[in-house]
Amino acid sequence: LGNTLVRTTGSGGRFEGWAIDGVTEPIDGLAVAAADRTHPGTTPHTETPHRNGIVRIDHVVVRSGDCDRTAAAFAAAGLEVRGGRSTTSYGSPMRQVFLWAGDVIIELVGPDAGEPTTDEPTSIFGLALVAADLDATAGHLGGLLGTPKEAVQQGRRIAGLRGREVGISLPVAVMSPHV
């Protein structure tokens, strides 16, 4: 998708792992597979939409019991923290830390500053994709995609993929392009 290689393996609808160019060791316990740029179809390319209208990955959501610990682990792996915020937009107070991995954003979420931290293992919590035309993608996917609504990012819209109907356990959202 765009400049990001997506290789599906295994069965059972579980998200089993990821690879980041230049990273070979686990990040705060989060397994990382070796990035294989010799695999057919791994040459970066322009945003060519799939027939469902998806053109690239927008961001990967990583959940941690301790944002400071996990952000430091990402920094040690060579990824730069590019911003962050505290929010209650999703209910309980939480912290979001944003990092870039190539052209994909990593959104690290966990307890807000001053909230108790935990030893909860770091995990992939969600995936957000970009559709060239969100309404067309929603039409193509029919009842498999929720109704598009305003996203947190100004000028963008978002809709959730109905994972149970699709057969996946990882929360997936589809977003309109950046404006």
PLM feature spans:
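Short helix-loop boundary/capping segments
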Residues: 85-87
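Glyoxalase I/VOC metalloenzyme domain signal
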Residues: 1-82, 93, 100-179
